[in-house]
């Protein structure tokens, strides 16, 4: 080994290393002394102070090889270009958040143009690209500036239309709307959990598909977050999970500027972030100067060198750097104004026009990000071609997994006379789907035994066994759902997650993001009504059905028996652009007459006639889930009195709403106004189906603690009460 003395620090290099010549080149004007030296760290970062009026150099020792990285005036110009494009876009819109882009531009630039392997020419089509998630989505102007400079399909004109109707540059990033955006992160904190999910997917697919000499899944997930993200509970849930899972290819860049919208974070956020993340099992790296490109680069290298822990790089920045009011909340969420922009540009020594990109900056991105990305993707294509020749079946499975095609499965029908809870029939469906869809995996928020989500004969997804298909999300409902979004966004798998339906309130913000992003995630929500019983009103859903049904682009399905549950799972696994929420019972449900033949087609229309009136149609009983059996029994009781009613099973209101007017009329004829809806949940939303002349047998108060059957009786879910209620129409 050998060392090079710089006057202040010792740099250790490997003798005859290819990097030695580069090292000598940088120090060619200085007398160099070499001597044998041993016992240094395998993974170390070394800094060199100014040498011969040169900028500070950085050396990173990874596995005893030395990497050199330097930055020059063009790099600084590129950083300032990101800043000025962001400021100009926000000013043109007269709306936006300039503080983060101005403060975080250096770390974002270093990451993008010097580290990330992405190819703007193929965008999100290359499965092994690095992923970047902007959890602090209010800093979208910075992301759009980077996307433009990187060469994605985003023009200067698009930047000028920031936050305008129909533009490619909405106020917060939206996947599938803006080229190159990886996730719609939405409210703060969720992007961190999305990144955790992406890193989980990478680890899972790598364990499943990689072979010696063929690391076809081998990429990093980077996320940029601020102080606000770390205050949110979902980020803490997700960070805890990531630390346990030892996701070494997950890197958070923390824009630590000590300012939130209301003012200094000292008013509300004073914890030891380093201590917290180290307790989670993360590596913490501090960058003291957020404008020091070399120090940022060293931190990213050190993060990539740590393979057993996720890394958070805390970068101390100045919010709104360069602005007259930098370092204050005044620059967080409002345009700087013409005078404010002029002040900042003067501080940057910016001599170019508004929205101008200097030619040398364009060239620097072409030589950096673009050239590196194209080379990396071509190398991967060559590797995959060889992999395909060596492992054709695995290669075909990999390609199929990323095609996001509708999965078709066959599920064993349930016979009349049998009885089981829909959560149990769901578990049987999960088992059968796992045997037919190799990319299918998931778990529960510490309720797998109750939600019945575990796949038998499969291993657990744990460190050292990332191939496992049973995921233990822990008591982290929000992080589970947000991580599922990241898993779905990554591609290559189909994921599900379960909890009690009453706990759905904990995860709805992430379900909303799934629906907004057209992600085919599946939520297994069990213990769906007051039939939960003894646990009492805190654990008995009432308003949840009405709440989730109001969410656009979410299939909410409450099946009546095992055959409807099968149909629900078939529908869910066939979806490619919409999440599905299955609402399932704790208590046993008998298989109903007719569902074996009618359920699949009927469920795919949202509602269907399960039992027709025996005479001239006088009225309609509409029910869902466990109450369909009550409707059938009520029909029989009314028939005994000479009253002829139809029973409509309506497992999914939203799917029914999407049917043609003709079909809806065939199920609920306008001329038939005597209608009774029966459901053990809120009445909210049922008026559109029963009309002004109809009634509901529902619950608009809280539940109680008692055996489930007794509660149903006390709340009027009996044949006698349903019969009298119908007759009162």
Curated annotation (Swiss-Prot):
Entry EC number(s): 2.2.1.1
Coiled-coil ranges per UniProt: none
Assembly notes: Homodimer.
Keyword Transferase attributed: yes
Source organism (scientific name): Streptococcus pyogenes serotype M6 (strain ATCC BAA-946 / MGAS10394)
Family, similarity comment: Belongs to the transketolase family.
Gene name in the database record: tkt
InterPro entries: THDP-binding (IPR029061), Transketo_C/PFOR_II (IPR009014), Transketolase-like_C_2 (IPR055152), Transketolase-like_Pyr-bd (IPR005475), Transketolase_bac-like (IPR005478), Transketolase_BS (IPR020826), Transketolase_CS (IPR049557), Transketolase_fam (IPR033247)
Catalytic activity: D-sedoheptulose 7-phosphate + D-glyceraldehyde 3-phosphate = aldehydo-D-ribose 5-phosphate + D-xylulose 5-phosphate
Class of this enzyme: transferase
Keywords noted in UniProt: Calcium, Magnesium, Metal-binding, Thiamine pyrophosphate, Transferase
Name the record gives this protein: Transketolase
CDD domains cross-referenced by the UniProt entry: TPP_PYR_DXS_TK_like, TPP_TK
SMART domains in alphabetical order: Transket_pyr
Pfam families the UniProt entry points to: Transket_pyr, Transketolase_C_1, Transketolase_N
One MF term in the entry's GO annotations: metal ion binding
GO annotations of cellular component type: cytosol
Annotated positions binding thiamine diphosphate: 138, 186-188, 228, 257, 332, 503
Known cofactor(s): Mg(2+); Ca(2+); Mn(2+); Co(2+)
């Amino acid at each position: 080994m050998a060392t090079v003395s710089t006057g202040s620090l010792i740099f250790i290099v490997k003798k005859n290393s290819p990097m030695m010549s580069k090292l000598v080149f940088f120090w060619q004007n200085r007398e160099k002394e070499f001597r044998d030296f041993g016992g240094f760290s395998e993974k170390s970062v070394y800094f060199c102070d100014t040498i011969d009026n040169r900028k500070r150099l950085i050396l990173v020792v990874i596995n005893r090889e030395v990497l050199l990285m330097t930055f020059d005036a063009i790099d600084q110009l590129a950083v300032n270009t990101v800043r000025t494009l962001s400021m100009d876009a926000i000013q043109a819109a007269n709306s936006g958040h300039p503080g983060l882009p101005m403060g975080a531009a250096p770390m974002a630039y270093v990451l993008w143009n010097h580290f990330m392997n992405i190819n703007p020419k193929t965008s999100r089509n290359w499965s092994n690209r690095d992923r970047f998630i902007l959890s602090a989505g209010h800093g979208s102007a910075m992301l759009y500036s980077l996307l433009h400079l990187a060469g994605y399909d985003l023009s200067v004109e698009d930047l000028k239309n920031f936050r305008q109707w129909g533009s490619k540059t909405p106020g917060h990033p939206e996947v599938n709307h803006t080229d190159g955006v990886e996730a719609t992160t939405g409210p703060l904190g969720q992007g961190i959990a999305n990144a955790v999910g992406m890193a989980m997917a990478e680890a899972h697919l790598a364990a499943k598909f990689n072979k010696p000499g063929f690391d076809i899944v081998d990429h990093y997930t980077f996320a940029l977050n601020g102080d606000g993200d770390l205050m949110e509970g979902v980020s803490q849930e997700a960070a805890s999970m990531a630390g346990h899972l030892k996701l070494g290819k997950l890197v958070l860049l923390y824009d630590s500027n000590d300012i939130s919208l209301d003012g200094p974070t000292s008013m509300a956020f004073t914890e030891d972030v380093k201590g917290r993340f180290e307790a989670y099992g993360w590596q913490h790296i501090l960058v003291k100067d957020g404008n020091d490109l070399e120090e940022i680069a060293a931190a990213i290298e050190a993060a990539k060198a740590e393979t057993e822990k996720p890394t958070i790089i805390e970068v101390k920045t100045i919010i709104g750097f360069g602005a007259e009011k930098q370092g204050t909340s005044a620059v967080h969420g409002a345009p700087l104004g013409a005078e404010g922009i002029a002040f900042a540009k003067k501080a940057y020594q910016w001599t170019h026009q508004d929205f101008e990109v200097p030619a040398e900056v364009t060239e620097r991105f072409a030589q950096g990000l673009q050239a590196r990305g194209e080379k990396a993707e071509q190398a991967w294509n060559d590797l995959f071609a060889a992999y395909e020749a060596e492992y054709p079946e695995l290669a075909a499975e990999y390609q199929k997994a990323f095609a996001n095609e509708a999965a078709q499965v066959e599920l064993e029908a349930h016979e009349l006379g049998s009885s089981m809870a829909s959560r149990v029939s769901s578990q049987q469906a999960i088992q059968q789907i796992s045997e037919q869809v190799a990319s299918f995996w998931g778990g529960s928020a510490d309720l797998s035994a109750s939600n019945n989500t575990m796949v038998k004969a499969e291993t657990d997804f744990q460190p050292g066994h990332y191939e496992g298909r049973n995921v233990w999300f822990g008591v982290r409902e929000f992080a589970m759902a947000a991580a599922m979004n990241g898993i779905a966004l990554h591609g290559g798998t189909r994921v599900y997650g379960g909890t009690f339906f009453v706990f759905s309130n904990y995860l709805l913000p992430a379900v909303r993001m799934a629906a907004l992003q057209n992600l085919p995630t599946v939520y297994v929500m069990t213990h769906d009504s007051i039939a939960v019983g003894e646990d009492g009103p805190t654990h008995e859903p009432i308003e949840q059905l009405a709440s989730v049904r109001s969410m656009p682009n979410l299939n909410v399905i409450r099946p009546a028996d095992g055959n409807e549950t099968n149909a629900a799972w078939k529908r869910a696994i066939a979806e490619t652009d919409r999440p599905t929420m299955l609402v399932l019972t704790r208590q046993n449900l008998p298989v109903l007459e007719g569902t074996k033949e009618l359920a699949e087609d009927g469920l795919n229309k949202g509602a269907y006639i399960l039992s027709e009136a025996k005479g001239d149609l006088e009225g309609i009983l509409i029910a869902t889930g466990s109450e369909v059996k009550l409707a059938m029994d009520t029909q029989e009781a009314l028939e005994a009195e000479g009253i002829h009613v139809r029973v409509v099973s309506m497992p999914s209101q939203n799917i029914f709403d999407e049917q043609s007017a003709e079909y809806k009329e065939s199920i609920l004829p306008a001329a038939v106004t005597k209608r009774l809806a029966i459901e053990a949940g809120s009445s909210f939303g049922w008026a559109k189906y029963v009309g002004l002349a109809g009634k509901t047998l529902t619950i608009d108060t809280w539940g109680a603690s008692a055996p489930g059957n007794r509660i149903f009786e006390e709340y009027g879910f009996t044949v006698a009460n349903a019969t009298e209620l119908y007759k009162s129409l």
